[in-house]
From Swiss-Prot:
Quaternary data: Forms part of the preprotein translocase complex of the outer mitochondrial membrane (TOM complex) which consists of at least 7 different proteins (TOM5, TOM6, TOM7, TOM20, TOM22, TOM40 and TOM70). Interacts with TOM20 and TOM70. Interacts with FCJ1.
Acidic residues: bias regions: 37-49
Membrane topology classification: Single-pass type II membrane protein
Entry-annotated residues carrying Phosphoserine: S44, S46
Annotated protein name in UniProt: Mitochondrial import receptor subunit TOM22
Family: Belongs to the Tom22 family.
Keyword Transmembrane helix: yes
Entries under NCBIfam families matching the protein: 3a0801s05tom22
Single Gene Ontology BP annotation: protein import into mitochondrial matrix
Source organism of this protein record: Saccharomyces cerevisiae (strain ATCC 204508 / S288c) (Baker's yeast)
Spans annotated as Disordered: 27-49
Disulfide partners: none
Gene Ontology cellular-component annotations: mitochondrial outer membrane; mitochondrial outer membrane translocase complex; mitochondrion
Length: 152
C-alpha cells in the first residue's frame, strides 16, 4: 500500500522572473533529467515497497517458495522427509516398547528376587547369632564344671 503525502518547502518562493523561450526549454530539459534520476530512485524504492507486505507471515513466505522449487525436486524432498520421519517415529516407538518391557520385567522379577535375597541374608545373620550364643553358653558351662570340680 502506498501513501502519498505532500511536502511543502519551508522556504518562501519569490515570483520567478520571466525567461526567454530558449532559457525555458533549457530549464525544462535540465529539470527533466534531474526528475528522471529522481524518478529512477523513486521507482526502485516503490518496487521494493510494492512487494513488501507487513502482514506476511513466515508460512506465506515458505508457501511462496513452492513456485521456485520444481515439482520433481519437491517430490524427492517430500519423499525423503516422509521416509526420515517414519523411520524416526518407528525407532522411538520400538525403543519405548523395549524400555517398557525391560522395566516391567525388572519390576516383576527383580523385586521378589531382591526380597528373597534380603530374607536369606537375615536368616544367615540369625544363624550366626545363635551359633555365637551357643558357643558362649558352652564356654560358660565349661567354666562352671571346672569351678565345681576345683571346689570339690
Amino acid at each position: 500500500m502506498v501513501e502519498l503525502t505532500e511536502i511543502k518547502d519551508d522556504v518562501v518562493q519569490l515570483d520567478e522572473p520571466q525567461f526567454s523561450r530558449n532559457q525555458a526549454i533549457v530549464e525544462e530539459k535540465a529539470s527533466a533529467t534531474n526528475n528522471d534520476v529522481v524518478d529512477d530512485e523513486d521507482d526502485s524504492d516503490s518496487d521494493f515497497e510494492d512487494e513488501f507486505d507487513e502482514n506476511e507471515t513466515l508460512l506465506d513466505r515458505i508457501v511462496a517458495l513452492k513456485d521456485i522449487v520444481p515439482p520433481g525436486k519437491r517430490q524427492t524432498i517430500s519423499n525423503f522427509f516422509g521416509f526420515t520421519s517414519s523411520f524416526v517415529r518407528n525407532a522411538f516407538t520400538k525403543s519405548g516398547n523395549l524400555a517398557w518391557t525391560l522395566t516391567t520385567t525388572a519390576l516383576l522379577l527383580g523385586v521378589p528376587l531382591s526380597l528373597s535375597i534380603l530374607a536369606e541374608q537375615q536368616l544367615i545373620e540369625m544363624e550366626k547369632t545363635f551359633d555365637l550364643q551357643s558357643d558362649a553358653n558352652n564356654i560358660l558351662a565349661q567354666g562352671e564344671k571346672d569351678a565345681a570340680a576345683t571346689a570339690n
